[in-house]
Design a protein with these regions (language model features):
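Short Gly/Pro-enriched turn/cap motifs at secondary-structure boundaries
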Residues: 120, 234, 243-246, 312-317
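Short glycine/proline-rich turn/loop motifs
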Residues: 17-19, 146-159, 235-240, 303-309
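Functional-site microenvironments in short loops/helix caps that host divalent-cation chemistry
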Residues: 156, 167-305
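A glycine-rich, coil/turn loop motif that links secondary-structure elements
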Residues: 22-28, 50-59, 129-130, 157-167, ...
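Short proline/glycine-enriched turn/loop segments at secondary-structure junctions
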Residues: 276-281, 309-317
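Active-site microenvironments of metalloenzymes and redox enzymes
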Residues: 108-116, 121-211, 327-331, 336
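GGW-centered surface loops in extracellular recognition modules
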Residues: 82-104
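Cellulosome-associated attachment modules in secreted, modular CAZymes
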Residues: 4-82, 149-155
Length: 339
């Protein structure tokens, strides 16, 4: 078992939380805690002490973080990043690497299981890559050199999802990223976003991106205060956005497509049967964002029949506006390899 929800054990429920990494409650963090954590995960007997990275869940990544602490002497879950699978395309820009997950395209019936929609409506998607995580502060700084103009006054952690974006902030970022990498990234179209969020050809038909239990896969209005308290206890004055990749990924290995920050989509619309990779651009067309955020309720986080959160203008900025990247597989230079 690689993942488990947990509950406070009775003798600790009313008292202080255990020190980070002290799985055995003996006020010492050592290899015995790694062994105990592995045992707890395999047997499903996890407690709050197994939550090494502070995301209110026990997971195999807590073991990884605990081992890092024993090897390097640091235990800071704000620097955590999810493991990158071999199938990912890894791109590096100015020393910062990020992963793109492959999404197999084909004929796609987006409304097949949606109420009050035409189940026969379909579009065609070619193969593409979707960002394994939302664009982070670290990546934004590597590309742009400074935070978004309207970002808050707090000091963000490098693996937080970047926020406070407008549509044109995203466009400026992508234009600069493409200059630096020689690749052709773009914002997700509506169909690309929903198809990937639902798990593509491996879709389990879940309500949220990877699960019917929103708490497994998303930071949203209903659980954000728990993690905020842990963050503020450890880092007073911390921001109100959250590190990426702390929840379970969906069927494609993509994180946070439900919750955390909402993700702005590309302009455009499409008629039935058209190729959704090439859209008519219209600067007057409204801008949408999908996926909900940690400021929104669960309804906004659905990937089946999601609520379309519309911005009135492409220059509109909201505190939970974030970005996820897309890259067409056909646009990659011949022989391109991860770097």
């Amino acid at each position: 078992m690689l993942f488990s929800a947990f509950a406070l054990v009775p003798d600790r429920a009313a008292g202080a939380l255990p020190m980070y990494g002290d799985v055995n409650f003996n006020e010492v963090v050592d290899i015995d805690d790694v062994i105990a954590l592995a045992d707890h995960l395999s047997t499903g007997t996890t407690t709050i002490a197994d939550d090494v990275n502070g995301d209110l869940e026990a997971h195999i990544r807590d073991i990884t973080l605990l081992i890092d602490y024993l090897l390097y002497g640091e235990l800071e879950f704000d620097l955590y990043s999810p493991p990158v699978p071999d199938s990912a395309l890894v791109v590096t820009v100015n020393g910062v690497s990020f992963a793109m997950m492959p999404v197999k395209g084909g004929d796609y019936y987006p409304y097949k299981n949606w109420p009050n929609h035409d189940p026969e409506f379909h579009v065609t998607l070619s193969d593409y890559y979707m960002g394994m995580t939302e664009v982070t502060i670290e990546l934004w700084l590597a590309v742009m050199g400074s935070r978004p103009l309207h970002a808050g006054l707090y000091t963000p952690k490098p693996n937080e999802a970047v926020d406070c974006l407008s549509f044109w902030d995203c466009k400026d970022f992508i234009a600069r990223l493409n200059e630096l990498t020689g690749l052709e990234f773009h914002m997700p179209t509506k169909a690309q976003w929903v198809y990937a969020a639902m798990g593509g050809q491996w879709s389990g038909g879940y309500t949220y991106a990877g699960s019917n239990d929103i708490d497994e896969v998303a930071w949203y209005e209903g659980n954000r205060l728990d993690i905020y308290k842990r963050l503020l206890d450890k880092w007073p004055g911390t921001s109100y956005e959250l590190p990426v990749g702390m929840k379970k990924p969906n069927e494609l290995g993509i994180y946070d497509m439900s919750g955390n920050v909402a993700e702005l989509l590309e302009f455009g619309h499409v008629e039935q049967g058209e190729n959704y990779d090439e859209l008519e651009r219209d600067s007057l067309y409204p801008v949408y964002k999908y996926g909900g955020s940690n400021f929104r309720n669960a309804s906004y986080c659905k990937v089946i029949d999601p609520i379309e959160a519309m911005l009135l203008h492409s220059f509109t900025i909201a505190i939970d506006n974030g970005l996820r990247l897309v890259l067409q597989a056909s646009s990659l230079p011949a022989g391109y390899r991860s770097k």
